[in-house]
């Protein structure tokens, strides 16, 4: 009860401190984000000839080195240090930088909490064990025992309840140096970040129970959702509207929008264009037994293209671990008028040996003519019905234009190939 009371005080303290300013359209924008910013952060694999404005490494360093009170991390796993065993040309130092920044933050009295998916032999917890020995609070969540299947797949970092990262990058040196990633860096925006903190708190609390609550209660109630978005002033005086969405349904608390609902709504709201960049796309489950057809996303895309004439472009990853069932569905979509599907292929690293499970576009985002969607989930049924994930759903013309430019850069790059290639 005391923990819940303190959490409510922290949450509603942020809301009370939020002054609102009316604009000419009658919308009310929260001034507690004045001086705040939102940026796109990318990881461009070494030896890939693409340019980005802000790297994931630099975004994380900015967050961690400037933390004053707290760092809360909801993650799949952490392997930041094992790249240090390789030749420096592979980029392992980037992970060591982040690990050292966490150690330094802990040393200067910053409270660090990490909740991770239950470790396994393939996903060891060496780094988090070592951090725990230094006093970092670490919890592991046995996801299948709570949900029935799936994993905690989220990648979110919340700092001082005012700044955050959310995106595709795992806490892994490979995600900084050898895998293509995309996420969002929020700075100095208490209202939206405190709402993101609620999702972290759900993971943190779920790690110490044997059964999920049927009703998450008022302390986990969302501040914003699809019908009541946060209205923010960011990047100077730019007006943003946005909300956080959550999967799976078992973690959708009161007033929270489900992730698949947010995704399909964005597709349904597009009037001109839908551009998708994601590692896996399949209108079915991938990890169930048996796997089953799940056309929720597919129907929305086909309806957008066929019924409304929306131009749909899909950039899907092809790599050593592409599931054999995926290409047939993409070939089918590519036959629909107004839908164009291409593969994105990251070439092997110039040096040998190759690092396993790298050299892939791991991003999970969509940009339409109306909005941006930046998430942590691959696009198959499993990720939305039994796997832990989050997304930021963002309405702002300039941000959407920037994300569109990134998509167009990749679409027109030498790493993009017709879907008929595979």
UniProtKB/Swiss-Prot annotation:
Residues 148-175, 357-383 form the PLD phosphodiesterase domain. The keyword Hydrolase applies. One of its GO terms (molecular function) is phospholipase D activity. Inhibited by butan-1-ol. It comes from the Eukaryota. Residues 1-18 form the signal peptide. InterPro entries: Diverse_PLD-related, PLDc_3, PLipase_D/transphosphatidylase. Its EC number is 3.1.4.4. Keywords: Glycoprotein, Hydrolase, Lipid degradation, Lipid metabolism, Repeat, Signal. It catalyses: a 1,2-diacyl-sn-glycero-3-phosphocholine + H2O = a 1,2-diacyl-sn-glycero-3-phosphate + choline + H(+). Belongs to the phospholipase D family. This is Phospholipase D Z. It comes from Dictyostelium discoideum. The gene is pldZ.
